[in-house]
């Protein structure tokens, strides 16, 4: 089984995953899958292009194949999914950084994964907290809202999505129910 968190930046995904590790020691956890496969330089917002996103897409594909194999043995929890990557790609397309062709291709890839139920449960984390400046992620609230809107659009017809809200303890309680 694959459980995944999804949400724009600064919604508490990594913090929540850290707490889940304590509660579910027999699960496999995949932290920051996009961060594992790229350098800080590749994730800089001023370097976004079809090329950079395509490199990230290829790396994510490889990581997904690994996780699909692991999930056959151990329940797996991810702190981000292909939905997140696609939402950012669509947002960057709206900002003119990514071509329409590449954005459409990634939207197709995302919809294919959702249709095939690659994720057993998707936990959506809406914007509830201030953006934390970690020197990498954007502090642009408009981008945060745009990505959140794209995520909601991608998940619109997904019946396996659960929205989590509140502080960390409230979110943990919602997951365990």
Feature-to-residue mapping (PLM):
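A basic- and aromatic-enriched beta-loop-alpha substructure that forms the phosphate/nucleotide-
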Residues: 59-100
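Pre-Walker A (Motif I) flank of P-loop NTPase domains
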Residues: 1-2
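Hydrophobic anchor at the beta1->P-loop junction of P-loop NTPases
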Residues: 5
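Conserved substrate/cofactor phosphate-moiety recognition/catalytic segment
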Residues: 21-63
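A glycine- and Lys/Arg-enriched "phosphate-lid" helix/loop adjacent to the NTP-binding pocket
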Residues: 88, 92-167
């Amino acid at each position: 089984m694959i459980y995944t968190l999804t949400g724009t930046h600064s919604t508490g995904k990594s913090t929540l995953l850290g707490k889940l590790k304590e509660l579910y020691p027999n699960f496999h956890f995949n932290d920051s899958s996009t961060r594992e496969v790229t350098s800080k330089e590749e994730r800089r917002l001023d370097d976004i292009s079809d090329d950079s996103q395509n490199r990230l897409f290829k790396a994510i594909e490889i990581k997904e194949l690994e996780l699909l194999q692991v999930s056959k043995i151990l329940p797996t929890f991810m702190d981000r999914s292909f939905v997140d990557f696609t939402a950012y790609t669509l947002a960057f397309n709206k900002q003119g950084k990514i071509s329409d062709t590449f954005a459409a291709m990634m939207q197709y890839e995302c919809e294919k994964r959702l249709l095939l139920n690659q994720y057993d449960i998707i936990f959506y984390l809406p914007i509830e907290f201030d953006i934390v400046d970690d020197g990498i992620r954007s502090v642009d609230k408009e981008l945060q809202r745009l990505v959140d809107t794209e995520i909601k659009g991608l998940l619109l017809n997904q019946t396996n999505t659960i929205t989590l809200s509140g502080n960390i303890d409230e979110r943990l309680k919602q997951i365990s129910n």
